[in-house]
Amino acid sequence: MRKKTIFKGSIAATSAAILAAGLLGTPARAADPVTITIWTFGDVIQRQLVQEYKNLHPEITLQIKKSDLDPLNGTNMVTACTSKTGPDIVAVEVQYSGYWRSYPKCFTDLRKMKTSEANVAAGVPAGKTALDFKKNYLPWRWEQGVGYDDSVMGFPTDVGGLEVAYRVDLFKKAGLPTERGAVGKLWPTWDKFIATGVKYNSKLSAADKKAGKGFIDNAGTLYAAIMNQGTEKYYRNDGTDAGKLIYDTNPQVKLAWNTTIKATEAGIGTRIGQYTSDWNIGMNKGTFATILAPAWMMDYIKQQAPDTTGKWDIADLPGGGGNQGGTQLTVPSYAEHAQEAYDFIAWYLAPEQELKVFKTYGLFPAASVLYKDPALLDYKDPFFNNAPVGKIYSEGVLKVKPIFEGKLQRAIDQAIGAGLGRVAAKKMTAAKSWAQVIVDIKKVINN
């Protein structure tokens, strides 16, 4: 009798377990299909990882919409926030972080989100908020995605660590050192960099000079590099959310302006605009010997000038470390699929994925937990003459000091860039152009 009772109980328990596991009755329903829309620019979202995530989640479609940076982070996002319609994820470039940190209500506060179990098997634990992941990233890069109300708007994708890409063959032809350590010692300061450019240009033939060849692709690129080596830019952190405008009193601004003017007037640049067809052609034909190259630009050079493999190398930036660019992936407050978007970001920007992206596309990780990892430090790039790019860029990034970014930072940058352009085109003297810059900035402030 006892055996019979146990037998019946076992059948009941087993049947319940089978039913619970979905092995009896109606088969378990597959996860509902979801389309995550992503607004981005450039190569922030990499196709290799998109496919990898698709393999993990066949039910999820990642719909990528690329736009130019300024309309994306400007009018497009303003319209989306105002109408409360738009994507599930938006890439916000650091030049716009000061602006959008002023409008945190346009974003989901990722402190209040928790990862689901969707990516546990891929190494992302469930139940984690943004603050649980904060320790993985460079503190100053993390802060660029924090709203003025302390909400977490987004995770950092990369750091635009800045160094000098140079053509070994062209340096040799000009009688300059070619080994990366010796090259870096040529220019401990920006003045020495300019002097090296003058020396390089003096070795060019009359035909090369007539063809517009020069030392650096565009001397105007010195401005941003020098500005980002300071501790302040256009705003001072005075304890308020907005900060105090110091664009007209900060000595770093005039130092960057004056040094860039000096380089321009010394004629070390070719005056070819970056990201133009002439720039791409110039990479292939040796029109210029150096580019101030953030880590993410390495892949661009590879794509545009594949036949120059082994001819390029990477040397230290004058004046110490540097940074140019970087992005946050954010979830708008009106996102239709906020949970799926947050799960994707937590996976996509995990250190493991950031390392893959660096090795494949050159975007240097914002995940500082990798900076002592041999997988990063020992990585060498064959295209760049086997330069230890992991070590070079990590050392440079660690020298960068955090800079307080205000709401109008991008607009002020654009006004100063226009001013430098007028001088380069010989439309104005440096003094008159600077006076016009101040007028233009005041218009932006008062608008």
Predicted regions and their residues:
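Short, solvent-exposed loop/beta-turn-alpha elements that line the ligand-binding surface or hinge
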Residues: 111-136, 181-186, 205, 214, ...
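Glycine-centered hinge/linker elements that transmit conformational signals in sensory
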Residues: 194-201, 238-273, 302
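Hinge/lid segment of periplasmic solute-binding proteins
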Residues: 96-163, 226, 311-313
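Mature extracytoplasmic/periplasmic domains
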Residues: 280, 299, 327-410
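Periplasmic-binding protein-like
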Residues: 310-330
